[in-house]
Amino acid sequence: MASIDGLPPLREVIRAHGLSAKRQLGQNFLLDLNLTAKIARLAGDLTNSDVLEVGPGPGGLTRGLLAEGARRVLAIEKDARCLPALAEVAAAWPGRLEVLNADALEVDVAARLTPPIRIVANLPYNVGTELLTRWLSSDWPPFWESLTLMFQKEVAERIVAKPGSKAYGRLALLSQWRTDPKIVLTLPPDAFTPPPSIHSAVVHFTRLEAPRHPADPKVLARVTAMAFNQRRKMLRSSLKGLVPDIETVLREAGIEPTQRAEEIPLEGFCALARRLAG
């Protein structure tokens, strides 16, 4: 990568700028430029796309995205210590990198980017799930074409989980309702500085133009929240109080009242949401 952008290896970058990952910000720096380039390639053809990156840190993935031909990258970094390193990346790729020192949860990113837009990020562990939920809960089709995101491996497995498994829950339902998510890369702890205690995984989400099954998003969100907040209870108990005769509504949706949330596929929850919406 250094031969492409003329910048030094990332270990030299963090040493020169005195950078160290802050656990309270959910940071773990990925310093292998071969891996960051691979993640950028897994995002697909970037040549005609704007790219949103959250938590770029010292800019390893940022460099990969630019080298893979991203039209423009908006990198949102909360940690001001990383800004000088990112400024060096911006100087190496004139006019193609905008660095925003902000909290990604508070930025209207769609207003700052030009479609088509792809989101590619090694998400900070402490906000990754919240950001994903927001991106999946927006008006559909959303402002983005695809998501290529790194999570703790446990979270990635929850995203792709199937009914009947311990990992299956609301995150799987929301992800699989509107996208086709796949784990495309697993990384060991020693790929990062400092090494986290767990493995990480990259998930690529291909958006669907329409949800797999019709359902009102707000009703579906409420039903799944109630069902999985008490996942070991029978649905007739966990959903009690939702409507006067929940057992009848469950049966009309093709669900036995004695079943539990983890047994019900996406299609079943969507059918239940439609019955409740009337």
Swiss-Prot record:
Keywords: Cytoplasm, Methyltransferase, RNA-binding, rRNA processing, S-adenosyl-L-methionine, Transferase
GO MF terms, alphabetically ordered: 16S rRNA (adenine(1518)-N(6)/adenine(1519)-N(6))-dimethyltransferase activity; RNA binding
UniProt superkingdom: Bacteria
The protein's Enzyme Commission number: 2.1.1.182
Any Gene Ontology CC annotation: cytosol
Main location as per UniProt: cytoplasm
One family name in Pfam for this protein: RrnaAD
Coiled coil location: none
Subcellular location per the Swiss-Prot or TrEMBL entry: Cytoplasm
UniProt-listed CDD domains: AdoMet_MTases (cd02440)
Catalytic reactions of this protein: adenosine(1518)/adenosine(1519) in 16S rRNA + 4 S-adenosyl-L-methionine = N(6)-dimethyladenosine(1518)/N(6)-dimethyladenosine(1519) in 16S rRNA + 4 S-adenosyl-L-homocysteine + 4 H(+)
Residues that bind S-adenosyl-L-methionine: 28, 30, 55, 77, 103, 122
Annotated HAMAP family: 16SrRNA_methyltr_A (MF_00607)
Protein family membership: Belongs to the class I-like SAM-binding methyltransferase superfamily. rRNA adenine N(6)-methyltransferase family. RsmA subfamily.
Function field: Specifically dimethylates two adjacent adenosines (A1518 and A1519) in the loop of a conserved hairpin near the 3'-end of 16S rRNA in the 30S particle. May play a critical role in biogenesis of 30S subunits.
Protein name: Ribosomal RNA small subunit methyltransferase A
Organism: Cereibacter sphaeroides (strain ATCC 17029 / ATH 2.4.9)
Classification of source organism: Bacteria, Pseudomonadati, Pseudomonadota, Alphaproteobacteria, Rhodobacterales
